[in-house]
């Protein structure tokens, strides 16, 4: 992939995170990355920081690229696709990260045979710890899927899923960081209530969540088994777990994922 040119249509937080991640991973060199955006000062900053090519004209970046990453808001996607329809040929791979927008939207709006891959990353891409679901379109090749997996693995973990589960991915990992931030805050609040200073409490709470996540990923053990490892009879941990269960923590998190997934489905129909 190192000789292929990647173009970003939209250079916001997610787009710029992907640029930095792919450069850092050595997947692509800065001179082979182009980015377009309506906000020219931001583009100039990216150019100075990363050494990439920039333009306020989307079509310029499309013409110069082999792989296009559409990193624009869902509400502006329709006009972007309409304006670029004749520029995006079947020789180019299109990767979109617009939430809730089905593959059929791109395949209907673009020229026949256009290769499209749909990706749902999350905000943790900004710290190279994203969780991304990837669904290839009907015209995408195995090489296209491999390229998408390589790009998004540069900023975290990426897995292939059928498009029918992309709304579930949105509800789980797309929205998920926002579900965890209040958990970190609440745990820290509990320690503050016990007399700890806020900075130390937040540091310990965030590290606790990070450590627990790493244990789940690296050991491959069921979360229930890991919980039991630190839960002694009549100990402190089981008292805390009892309080969480009384508050319905499991149902609350399950419902959060379900509601977010349902909202993603609703947005996809608009």
Swiss-Prot record:
Annotated knockout phenotype: Mutants are auxotrophic for proline.
Q: Which SUPFAM superfamilies match?
A: 6-phosphogluconate dehydrogenase C-terminal domain-like, NAD(P)-binding Rossmann-fold domains
Looking at the Swiss-Prot or TrEMBL record, what is one Pfam family this protein matches? F420_oxidored
List the pathway annotation: Amino-acid biosynthesis; L-proline biosynthesis; L-proline from L-glutamate 5-semialdehyde: step 1/1
Residues spanning the signal sequence: none
> Which family does the UniProt entry place this protein in?
Belongs to the pyrroline-5-carboxylate reductase family.
The cross-references to HAMAP family, in alphabetical order and at most eight, read: P5C_reductase
Record's function text? Catalyzes the reduction of 1-pyrroline-5-carboxylate (PCA) to L-proline.
Instruction: List the protein's name.
Output: Pyrroline-5-carboxylate reductase
Q: Which organism is it from?
A: Methanosarcina acetivorans (strain ATCC 35395 / DSM 2834 / JCM 12185 / C2A)
Coding gene?
A: proC
């Amino acid at each position: 992939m190192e000789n292929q040119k990647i173009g970003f249509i939209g250079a916001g937080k997610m787009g710029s995170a992907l640029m930095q991640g792919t450069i850092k991973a050595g997947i692509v060199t800065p001179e082979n990355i182009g980015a377009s955006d309506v906000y020219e000062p931001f583009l100039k900053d990216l150019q100075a920081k990363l050494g990439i090519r920039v333009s306020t004209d989307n079509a310029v970046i499309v013409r110069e690229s082999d792989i296009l990453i559409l990193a624009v808001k869902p509400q502006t996607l329709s006009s972007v696709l309409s304006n670029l329809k004749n520029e995006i040929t079947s020789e180019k791979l299109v990767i979109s990260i617009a939430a809730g927008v089905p593959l059929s939207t791109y395949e209907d709006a673009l020229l026949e045979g256009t290769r499209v891959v749909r990706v749902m990353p999350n905000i943790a891409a900004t710290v190279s710890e994203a969780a991304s679901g990837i669904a290839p379109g009907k015209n995408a090749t195995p090489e296209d899927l491999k390229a998408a997996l390589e790009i998004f693995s540069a900023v975290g973990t990426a897995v292939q899923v059928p498009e029918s589960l992309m709304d579930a991915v949105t509800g789980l990992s797309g929205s998920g960081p926002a579900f965890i931030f209040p958990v970190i805050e609440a745990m820290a609040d509990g320690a503050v209530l016990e007399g700890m200073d806020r900075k130390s409490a937040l540091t310990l709470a965030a590290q606790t969540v990070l450590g627990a996540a790493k244990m789940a990923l690296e050991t491959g053990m069921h979360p229930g088994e890991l919980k039991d490892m630190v839960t002694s009879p009549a100990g402190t941990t089981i008292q805390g777990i009892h309080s969480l269960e009384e508050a319905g923590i499991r149902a609350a998190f399950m419902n959060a994922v379900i509601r977010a997934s349902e909202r993603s489905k609703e947005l996809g129909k608009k």
